[in-house]
Amino acid sequence: MPLDKKFKDVLSLNFGKDDEIHVGLLASSGQFNNGTITLDEIDEFIAEYKDDYNVFMCYAPIDGEDRLLENAKPTRFLVADIDGAEIPKEFPPSYYWETSPNKYQGLWISDKVIAPKDYEVLAHAMVKKFKFDSASDIVHLYRIPTTINHKYATPQEVSEPKGDGTVYRRQDIFC
């Protein structure tokens, strides 16, 4: 299933037509492959790989071939693994998707870009405040909605993104 147009429009806040999006594929054998695609290629990428691989992407732009912290560019998104925690009612994600039963990932949209060093501070504060999974660096790979989670004996569909698309004022991201 392709990503819905609205969510692709959200992704375009961070990625221009020709910008590279860093992606990853995890095979059941444990072999991991990194690569890049453009936003125009995302539906084809999902269709080609979701049935056989865990499919991930980095939601922050990267300058260069390597997905390293020093190559991260400013982003409009904060992204987090909400595994084992409640979706916060006082600071709900702009969009979230279920990656397996009762486990979610969320994306918060900022009205202004967030510098990589500020992202790290905000992400760690969110982890602490809301008890999110600690894997929260700006270049972390997260599941792509509408793919399949092959981590379990019975594969789980990753849901379509849900949420109202709230755009948070940068100064109100309080974490």
Predicted feature descriptions by range:
Residues 96-105, 142:
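Short, conserved phosphate-binding/catalytic loop or strand-edge motifs used
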Residues 88-96:
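Active-site palm subdomain of RNA-directed nucleic acid polymerases
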